[in-house]
Amino acid sequence: MKTLKLSACAIAIFTAMNANAVELNGKNLTQQDAWAIAEGAPVTIAPEAMNRVQKSYDLVLDAAKNGREIYGLTVGVGLNKDHKVLSANGELSDEVKAASRRFNYSTLRSHSIAAGPILDPKLVRLAMAIRLNTLLNGGSGVQPRVAELYAEFLNKGVTPVIPTKGSLGDADITL
């Protein structure tokens, strides 16, 4: 009997905690919902949105495996867009994936400078919510784990410190 009461209590608490959760699906985020997330509302991701993210990611990997040039994955970014970073040769081996990780780490380090006052955390949460919802459209080719991490960070109150001048752009951090 105690277990049943505890389970019912846990379900009630979980339901109450998620009663005000905003479900993101990549299609219809309202200003009201976006500001609710900025103020601390938790988020959930609609399953169909994660399916789109997975399909998009699979498409990018298939293109890379077939020797297609993929911006930021098989070729550089910015002025290095014409520079081949790695060759998939029909297969994304552990070596190719490691080379891609090294490239991305190097890119992040080269962009890791910023200045100015720190952006209000609510505005950062707002930007994170909008970015997550955009990723859920399924057009970016991003790894599904990136979308999951955005949701986890929002739900756990993990908010990056973002200086207002010279910060890295969102397109530089999604692949």
Feature-to-residue mapping (PLM):
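Bacterial N-terminal signal peptides that target proteins for export
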Residues: 1-8
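N-terminal signal peptide c-region/cleavage motif recognized by signal peptidases
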Residues: 16-19
